[in-house]
Design a protein with these regions (language model features):
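N-terminal small/polar loop signature for handling phosphorylated ligands or for N-terminal nucleophile
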Residues: 42, 48-111, 197-257
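Short glycine-centered, acidic/aromatic-flanked micro-motifs in structured strand/loop junctions
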Residues: 51-53, 184-186, 258, 340, ...
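Active-site nucleophile and cofactor-binding loops and adjacent substrate-binding regions
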Residues: 76-85, 263-266, 288-289, 310-311
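An N-terminal, well-structured beta->alpha segment
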Residues: 1-67, 71-73, 97, 151-182
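Gly/Ser/Thr-enriched, mixed-charge loops and adjacent short helices
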Residues: 2-9, 22, 112-239
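Phosphate-binding and adjacent anionic-ligand microenvironments
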Residues: 243, 279-459
Length: 459
């Protein structure tokens, strides 16, 4: 009798948002980019859009990845330095087989990454990533004959088309009439090439900070956290601006500062925009993840809309929106998805929509204050990957009799607060988020469950 053997486990390359690593380490050097490009080309089989953010290592990695793609017979359309959503727009509107973005998004400058885009412009599904990982691991590359090797073709008009399409999807006349003033911080990233053009086309007066592409990120790290947005907050407070707009490195995310200098976390922006979309079209479906603030659900229900909660991750939210007809979605990190434009996070589109909302409804601080507010607390604790499932099962068992949501990890809902314990998909840790009306209660709840997780890990 022949004994069947399981296929060998394939090492995981793709994390939540592509493959990332420190430049010129084994995880992210030119040899890796070449072979991964061959694996991607073997899978995609057609015209591939290729773009980069503003990082210093982009030309090296782009050249290697492009060589790999062409070796499999794919024609590569080089879009140059563009925001990730601009590349996604190019893939979708120019009938490409897929796209490859060289970016590490908000990571520090010594990092870079490679991200794959499906033919419909959405972030690649995990199933497709697993296929590419297997091709890479087995070196099962398609190799084109000498007369079928792909070509590298410049594709330089995508930014203008993208900007024009964004402007056409908001009430530009209302924005112009409002006479808005904006402080714009592009974080020295790819958004520097797009968002100023959007503001100009909308007739917005603006002042820029850090809006020249510079892969060293000299002003601040490209993650738009409260700590990294202090300069724009001070400018808004001092300069009489209607809002501040801040992008991450590849401009798929946007956070906003209101006219008083108050930083709005992404779920506040999500709640504000969701409220006004649902008010305009009652019954609209908004999609967010189970770790988002309750303020999003409150805002949607106040406006007569419907809400659906998913696992954490923008690809999941986008696909649920597409399947169930969601009009809008997003997450706490400032990644907002507008179904009437494209099913991916889009920082420039988010900026245009918020400008339209403020122009029609009043000051951003007022819109924010109209939405119920809660206090959140976030922490994390180490856990070996092999123990994560057992810890989650135990927590779910212990919560029997309570209101529990196991969409992503374990979320336990009480009358006036909640806590979620969810395993990271890329690190050996648990993330623990809590929310309550009082900051002290949110902190106590998160710390209590952190201690419980730590005891279960040790058991």
């Amino acid at each position: 009798m022949v004994k069947k053997t399981r296929p060998a486990a394939v090492p995981r390359l793709f994390g939540t948002n592509g493959v990332r690593g420190i430049v010129n380490s084994r995880e992210m050097d030119s040899q890796f980019a070449l072979k991964l490009g061959m694996a991607i080309g073997t899978f995609m089989k057609g015209r591939v859009m290729l773009g980069t953010d503003a990082r210093t290592s982009n030309e090296m990695l782009k050249s290697a990845c492009a060589a790999g793609l062409m070796a499999t017979g794919c024609d590569v359309l080089d879009c140059g330095v563009v925001p990730t959503p601009t590349l996604q727009y190019a893939v979708r509107t120019d009938d490409a087989a897929g796209g490859v973005m060289i970016t590490a998004s908000h990571n520090p400058p010594e990092f870079n990454g490679i991200k794959c885009i499906d033919s419909d412009g959405t972030e690649m599904s995990r199933a497709s990533e697993e296929t590419i990982e297997r091709i890479y691991a087995e070196q099962a590359f398609s190799r084109a004959s000498w007369d079928r090797v792909g070509r590298l073709v410049p594709h330089t008009n995508v930014i203008d088309r993208y900007v024009t399409d964004i402007v056409s999807r908001v009430d530009a006349e209302a924005i112009r009439k409002a006479g808005l003033r904006v402080a714009l911080d592009c974080g020295n990233g790819a958004g520097s090439l797009v968002s100023p053009k959007v503001l100009e086309r909308l007739g917005v007066k603006y002042v820029t900070l850090n809006s020249n592409p510079d892969g060293a990120f000299p002003a601040h790290n490209s993650e738009p956290t409260p700590e990294n947005t202090r300069d724009v907050v001070e400018l808004v407070r001092a300069g009489g601006f209607d809002m501040g707009i801040v992008h991450d490195g590849d401009a798929d995310r946007t956070v906003f500062i209101d006219e008083t200098g108050r930083y709005l976390f992404g779920d506040r922006s999500l709640a504000i925009l969701a409220y006004h979309m649902c008010k305009a079209k009652p019954g609209s479906l908004v999609v967010t993840n189970v770790a988002s603030s309750r303020c999003v659900e409150d805002a949607v229900r106040m406006a007569g809309g419907r809400i659906m909660l998913t696992r954490v991750g923008s690809p999941t939210i986008a696909r649920v929106m597409k399947e169930y007809g969601g009009v809008f979605g997003g997450e706490e990190n400032g990644g907002l998805i507008f179904a009437d434009f494209q099913y991916c996070r889009d920082g420039a589109m988010a900026a245009a929509k918020m400008l339209e909302t403020v122009a029609k409804n009043g000051k951003l601080s007022k819109l924010n204050d109209e939405i119920p507010s809660y206090c959140q607390f976030k922490t994390k604790t180490p856990c070996p990957d092999e123990k994560k499932d057992a810890v989650i099962r135990r927590l779910a068992d212990e919560a029997k009799g309570l209101k529990v949501d196991t969409t992503d990890g374990v979320k336990i809902l009480f009358d006036d607060c909640w806590v979620i314990v969810r395993p990271s998909g890329t690190e050996p840790i648990f993330r623990i988020f809590s929310e309550a009306k009082e900051e002290s209660k949110a902190k106590e709840l998160a710390e209590r469950y952190k201690k419980r997780v730590e005891s279960l890990v040790k058991a």
